[in-house]
């Protein structure tokens, strides 16, 4: 039984909390820069410009990086029909549709808001899934669009990337141990480095935690839209099994986009789930089984 897809209160609360904590973290970093005597006006202007570019052009950047091609209803009528029907059920404007020519079975959604969203699937995904399974995967991606979690994740990840860049290039820029610097200057440089490290680490784990929860929320949304959690579970098993047979070299080329995929290109064991953008397959299947039982009880 299909039901109306509403907002996910749990995800909304977590997104607000994550953004609040990250904002506090970045204000702390600016305070450290001020304490160290660093003129951060230019840094703020540069970051603001890059953030604007990331916000407005993220969809084009992701599609270009993945080699995705937007397709018309004439080129992919069945795919467009599925997307259009699910978008109507989710009370969303129909997103643009793209296909990625790769044997790796996966799907993702991108775009700064529902009016500018793109849903993309790979040729490998369309070849492996039944129409019902494909519908369930598309329902998952459209739930991301509905929840607007793509935008929050993109903005949050941008600042974490800036902090990571500072940490990784610190010693290249001269480090705290270069010659010709007095003791206070070396201490200030080390202070900025340590603050960048803290910002990066805390941001990393906050974003990963939000990313894992949003996958559960999207799985739930797919179950509501299609009325069939079992079809999504079947699709996840097929995708995960197919990914295991793809050469690691090919998977690593797509690893940077793990947060956008329905299944990460590379996944670790359960011990490493804390570092993952997605919950483990086992946890997602167990969650979908619970949803199916709940839906059966309501029928």
Curated annotation (Swiss-Prot):
- Top-level EC class, please? hydrolase
Gene Ontology CC entries for this record: plasma membrane
Major localisation: membrane
Annotated membrane-spanning segments are 15-35, 37-57, 158-178, 187-207
| The keyword Membrane appears for this protein | yes
Top-level taxon of origin: Bacteria
Q: Which InterPro entries match?
A: HtpX_protease, Pept_M48_protease_HtpX, Peptidase_M48
State the Gene Ontology BP annotations: proteolysis
One GO molecular-function entry? zinc ion binding
Which cofactor is essential here? Zn(2+)
Q: Identify the catalytic residues.
A: 141
Q: Which Gene3D superfamilies match?
A: Metalloproteases ('zincins'), catalytic domain (3.30.2010.10)
> Keywords assigned by UniProt?
Cell membrane, Hydrolase, Membrane, Metal-binding, Metalloprotease, Protease, Transmembrane, Transmembrane helix, Zinc
Give the EC number(s) listed in the UniProt record.
3.4.24.-
Cellular localisation: Cell membrane
> What is the membrane topology noted in the UniProt record heading this document?
Multi-pass membrane protein
CDD domains, per database record: M48B_HtpX_like (cd07327)
Among Pfam families, the record links this protein to: Peptidase_M48 (PF01435)
HAMAP family given in the database record: Pept_M48_protease_HtpX
Its recorded name reads: Protease HtpX homolog
């Amino acid at each position: 039984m299909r039901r109306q897809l509403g907002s996910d209160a749990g995800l909304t609360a977590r997104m607000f909390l994550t953004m609040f904590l990250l904002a506090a973290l970045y204000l702390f970093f600016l305070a450290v820069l001020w304490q160290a005597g660093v003129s951060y006006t230019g840094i703020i202007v540069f970051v603001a410009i890059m953030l604007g570019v990331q916000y407005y052009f993220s969809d084009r950047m992701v599609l270009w990086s993945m080699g995705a091609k937007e397709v018309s209803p004439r080129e992919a009528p069945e795919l467009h029909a599925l997307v259009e029907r699910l978008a109507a059920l989710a009370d969303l404007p129909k997103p643009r549709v793209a296909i990625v020519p790769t044997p790796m079975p996966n799907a993702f959604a991108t775009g700064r808001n529902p009016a500018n969203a793109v849903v993309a699937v790979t040729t490998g995904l369309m070849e492996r899934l039944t129409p019902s399974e494909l519908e369930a995967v598309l329902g998952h991606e459209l739930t991301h669009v509905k929840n607007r979690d793509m935008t929050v994740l993109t903005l949050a990840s941008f600042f974490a990337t800036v902090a990571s860049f500072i940490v990784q290039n610190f010693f290249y820029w001269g480090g705290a141990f270069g010659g010709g610097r007095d003791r206070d200057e070396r201490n200030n440089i080390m202070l900025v480095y340590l603050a960048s490290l803290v910002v990066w680490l805390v941001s990393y784990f906050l974003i990963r935690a939000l990313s894992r929860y949003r996958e559960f929320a999207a799985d739930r949304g797919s179950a509501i839209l299609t009325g069939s959690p079992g079809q999504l579970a079947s699709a996840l098993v097929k995708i995960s099994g197919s990914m295991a047979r793809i050469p690691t070299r090919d998977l690593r080329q797509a690893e940077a986009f793990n947060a956008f995929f329905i299944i990460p290109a590379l996944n670790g064991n359960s011990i490493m789930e804390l570092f993952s953008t997605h919950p483990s397959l086992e946890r997602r299947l167990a969650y979908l089984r619970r949803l199916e039982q709940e839906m059966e009880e309501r029928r």
